[in-house]
Each structure stands twice: as structure tokens, then as C-alpha cells.
Amino acid sequence: MASKDFAIGMILLSQIMVGFLGNFFLLYHYSFLCFTRGMLQSTDLILKHLTIANSLVILSKGIPQTMAAFGLKDSLSDIGCKFVFYVHRVGRAVCVGNACLLSVFQVITISPSEFRWAELKLHAHKYIRSFILVLCWILNTLVNITVLLHVTGKWNSINSTKTNDYGYCSGGSRSRIPHSLHIVLLSSLDVLCLGLMTLASGSMVFILHRHKQQVQHIHGTNLSARSSPESRVTQSILVLVSTLCYFTRSPPSLHMSLFPNPSWWLLNTSALITACFPMVSPFVLMSRHPRIPRLGSACCGRNPQFPKLVR
């Protein structure tokens, strides 16, 4: 085993452990809320599904890539390769969809009554579960089903000269036109979600900035320097959106989608980048989101008081 492969394997293993710990804590938190309250609030429900999707991405991409880095490149069968590739694609798409839904739902929730979309508050709370189920899970499971047609195990592609090597699995030969159409479809969904997230985040910054100015006008300019719940929510959403935009549309990820037979450097760089958002997002939420306790507070048995800004 080359030293560079061992180093990549250790980094991937560290990402899996850290990401799994953060997402497991959030899943435990939301499961506890579900059992104690009987039903999760809308924001909690979105974050729960985002956490589930994060876990799917970490496990389906991180574990096979780590095994390949440690020399176990032929460990997955044909069915195993199809399964992990399909789960990873669906999990990644659901991550983007839930993050988009979270941004849009948050800006609707905190919109003042004079905003036009404030009328959507009641409808958004009522149909949020349908949005998550249909737009995030069902749509993405259908769109990504073509993965099952071209991904195979490496042992099943040894005698084929028209395969794309992805480290632990292979992609069979495909017609360029259907493949290009599939890439355009997936990219269009990503661009739509990322555009909605950017618009919603910008609107939220504007709303919260105007709210801060109104508070300063009422109470004077001598406000506490401590970060307010409004600014913490704004920062957490902006960090999540910025992180997702960068790691989803990074140059290595785009290159992996457009060009076959990626190099060793591109293959492993893409794997490291792919795991960054699922690994970072739970800790961003725990550190700044007012409704989620910090990991240290939960471990020490503290019960922090949550602001009521986010519903």
C-alpha cells in the first residue's frame, strides 16, 4: 500500500467518524423530541431528514472509498456497487433538497405580516411533510434510478475496455446523449435548489437586518454585544448554504460528473470534498442554531433554554 493511499484512507476514516458522531447526536436529539412531544415541529422535521441524508452520504461514499484507499478495491459485488452508488446519489440529492426547503421555510416563517409570502405560513406548516416526502425523497429516488443501469462491480468489468474506473466500482459504457441528458437534468435540479437557497438566504438577511434596526430604534443603540438569536440563525443558514454551494459544485465534483476515468488525485479529492458538508453541517447547527443543544451541553446533562425565534 502506498503512503499516499494510507494517508487518504486515514483522512476519510476521520471524516466518517466525526460526521457519524455529529449526525448520530442530531438523530438522537430529534428522536427524543419525537418520543417526548409526539410530533416534531416543521423545522425539526426538515433538519431530521437532512441529518438522515447526511448519514447516507457519509456511509455510502465514505466507507467504500476508505476500503479502496486501504487496498480493498474489489470487495463490492455488482449488486453492492449499484446499491452504494444509488444510495449516495439519492442521499446527496436529498441533502440539497432539504437544505433548500429549510432556507425557504425559514424565510417564510420569520416574514413580517406585510410581506406577500407571509400568507404562505399556514400552508407551509400544513404541507411540509408532503414536500419532504414527494419533492425530496420520491423525486430523487426516481431521477437517480439510472445509476442502477451502468454501475457494476470491478470484477464484472475486467474484460471490458469501455469502463470508467471509480476506485471501488466501475461504470459501464454509456451512450453520450442519454448520459448528457441525465447530467443536464441533475444539474438543473441542483441549480434550481441552490438558486432558491441563495434567494431565501438573502431575503432572510434583509428581514433580520431590518428587525435589528427596529429594535435599535426602540431600545436605543446601547445593545449588548453578545450575538442575538437572530444573528445566530442568520449565520448558521448562511454558513450551511455557502458550504453546500461550494462542496456541491466544486471543480472536482463537476469534473467527476463530466469526464470519465478520473485520475487518482481527482477521485480522492472528490471523495474528501463530498464528505465535507455532511460532516460539517451538524456541528454548524449545534454551534449556532438556537433550537439545538450543543454536544457538550447534552453530554454534561445541561438543559439550555432555547429562544423562540425559529418555529
Curated annotation (Swiss-Prot):
Membrane-topology descriptor: Multi-pass membrane protein
Keyword match Glycoprotein: yes
Cellular component GO terms held in the UniProt record: plasma membrane
Pfam families on file: V1R
Ranges in the topological domain labelled Cytoplasmic: 27-51, 114-130, 209-232, 286-311
Misc remark: The gorilla and orangutan orthologous proteins do not exist, their genes are pseudogenes.
Protein name in UniProt: Vomeronasal type-1 receptor 3
Organism name: Homo sapiens
Organism classification: Eukaryota, Metazoa, Chordata, Craniata, Vertebrata
Gene: VN1R3
